[in-house]
Amino acid sequence: FGATGGGVWKTENGGETYENISDGFFGGSVGAIAIAKDDPNVIYVGGGEVTIRGNVSSGYGVFKSVDAGKTWSFSGLPNSRHIPRIVIDPTNNDIVYAAVLGNLYKPTQDRGVYKSIDGGVTWKKVLYVNNLSGAFEIVLDPNNSRVLYASTWRVQRTPYSLSSGGDGSDLWKSIDNGESWTKISTNSGFPTGTIGVIGVTVSPLNSERVWAIVENQEKGGVYRSDDGGENWIYTNSSRSLRQRAWYYSKIYADTQDIDGVYVMNVA
């Protein structure tokens, strides 16, 4: 599956051709797609672009399919505007988390991490920071779905400018299925000063190995923790990994090499 400003697209031949499967059900602005691990018929889509350029377009909540994208139904969070990430608990398809960035142009309380335990019928806000800081990233520990990491991002947009960073831009950890959260971006080794957007990933080979890519003027770049976020090591400051942070800032742990990690950007 893929998503762009033109909705959700599906391929059944390894990417050679794609077919739009969202026209007629919801708008073209899409920020997140999640597919249930043990049932690929179950799909969630979050509206609103993640790459918040000046011409960014917003979405209108979560949509769900139970027939691999043939049909869709509205699944809540109508005021979310921008949903950068949706994750489904691999042990229970009815448990779903949504990172809601919210309205980019004005303060709103419709931000944060939301959780559903009934397959998207109802949602509960489980992490809220302030009315200018929404949730950007959520990841589950691949070895223990009770453990989650989430980043929140203070960001405001106008048609001609973007303000990234400040109070509310933080990294968080939960060890109880998202019911409570502890801030880990103030732990030893994490950068200080004004922090912007944060990407995070957990190694499937060792749950204690956590990587983060952090927007920070003085010490932005890649950070590694070997103890589940208790302490951090600054591993790479290359600007080529962190330029245009608001556009990229995604990081992924290698599934075969515990020291392998991937960051998307432009050279």
Regions found by a protein language model. Name each.
Residues F1-A267:
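Beta-propeller blade termini and top-face loops
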